[in-house]
Amino acid sequence: MNNNRKIFEEVQNFVQNYDLNKDGSVTSYDIYLSFLKKMNGDVYKASQATGVLCSTIDMDHDGKFTYCEIAKYCVDKAKKQIEQNAEIAALADVEAMLLRFDKDKDKKLSQTEFLEYFKGRGYTPYSDRDQYLKIIDLDKDGCVSVNELQEWFKKRRIDYATMLSARGPNC
């Protein structure tokens, strides 16, 4: 499923959760009523939560939530989630990579082992085959360790999240 489809579905879920009168649009009043219901009639907490959510989503402060405003909120939320999970996901990526490419089982990849990763995807990463060492091999020992791989995968995930957020939704 592509990113725009996911964002569209998130927006639809948002509208379904907060559009209590089912008129197809979400206003700050809809948000307030939804929170009031979820907070068992606690006016103070509902007002507070509404204020926080509205100040986060309603960028033009008109009391209404456009598709673009809700989609931007969903993209930013997804970016934060990716960033929070980047460390754990990177470790899983590293484990999978080591299982497949660490032929001598020394828990690090030689230049040859590392380049197999890229060849398996149909390309060589750089015109200068040693350039990966300059980028990933932080301790300059000629091999890529678990920690170096984890940092590399983590950075790739965070860069991806940043790119998604910067590009934003197609409105």
Swiss-Prot record:
Disulfide bonds: none annotated. Ca(2+) 3 binds at residues 137, 139, 141, 143, 148. GO terms for molecular function: calcium ion binding. Residues 6-41, 57-80, 89-124, 130-159 form the EF-hand domain. Keywords: Calcium, Metal-binding, Repeat. Pfam families: EF-hand_5 (PF13202), EF-hand_7 (PF13499). Ca(2+) 1 binds at residues 19, 21, 23, 25, 30. Ca(2+) 2 binds at residues 102, 104, 106, 108, 113. This is Calcium-binding protein F-like. It comes from Dictyostelium discoideum (Social amoeba). The lineage of its organism: Eukaryota, Amoebozoa, Evosea, Eumycetozoa, Dictyostelia.
